[in-house]
């Protein structure tokens, strides 16, 4: 909001992302499972309705009591606040997810900037992804909501190696609030690409109440 009036901001992020996911499933009837019991955020009504309209059903999945079903076309791990269990526990959730991915499974993973998840971080590292501590602050005012540097308007990635963003309306801004940065690197067997990028002026701040920053 501005002091001289108001401005409307359209958030089409979920529909843009689900449109890309729809391309991966070829429009056939599919089932997407979202994990539970790690403090994850439940899928929003917008996401559920959009996927349903594209013939994709959402189902909850507790990895502590169930294997990943064979009909799982997409596994969603949505901002867990507690870590996945590893091989030092009764159930090895990390290996379950790892095996699912190694067999060609697809995953949609969002992170929580405030909680430590070393097991999940180790799994991400195998695919060229590392979380940056803190939350992203945008230093370029054209890439953030006016007066709110934590509300980002990132640029779409070029996605040279994939077609994940083909057909996405790039003139529609995706707004991300209190987002966490990721370092993306290529590993021997995996090509990792950024779908959304901040400006060069953005940085991570670990303590939002201090002036300390991390480039």
Where are these regions (language model features)?
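Short, surface-exposed patches at the edges or C-terminal ends of soluble domains, predominantly
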Residues: 1-215
């Amino acid at each position: 909001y501005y002091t001289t009036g108001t401005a409307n901001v359209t958030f089409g992020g979920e529909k843009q992302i689900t449109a890309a996911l729809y391309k991966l499933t070829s429009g056939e009837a599919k089932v997407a499972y979202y994990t539970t019991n790690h403090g994850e955020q439940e899928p929003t009504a917008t996401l559920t309705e959009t996927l349903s309209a594209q013939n994709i059903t959402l189902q909850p999945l507790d990895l502590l009591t169930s294997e990943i079903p064979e009909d799982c076309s997409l596994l969603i791990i949505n901002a867990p606040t507690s870590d996945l269990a590893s091989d030092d526990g009764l159930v090895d959730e990390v290996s379950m997810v790892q095996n699912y991915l190694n067999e060609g499974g697809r995953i949609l993973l969002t992170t929580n900037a405030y909680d430590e998840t070393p097991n999940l971080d180790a799994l991400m590292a195998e695919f060229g992804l590392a979380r940056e501590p803190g939350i992203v602050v945008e230093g370029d005012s054209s890439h953030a909501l006016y007066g709110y540097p934590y509300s980002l308007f990132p640029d779409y990635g070029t996605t040279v190696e994939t077609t994940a963003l083909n057909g996405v309306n790039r003139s529609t801004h995706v707004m991300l609030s209190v987002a966490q940065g990721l370092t993306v690197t290529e590993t021997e067997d995996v090509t990792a690409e950024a779908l959304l990028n901040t400006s060069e002026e953005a940085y991570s701040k670990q303590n939002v109440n201090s002036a300390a920053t991390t480039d």
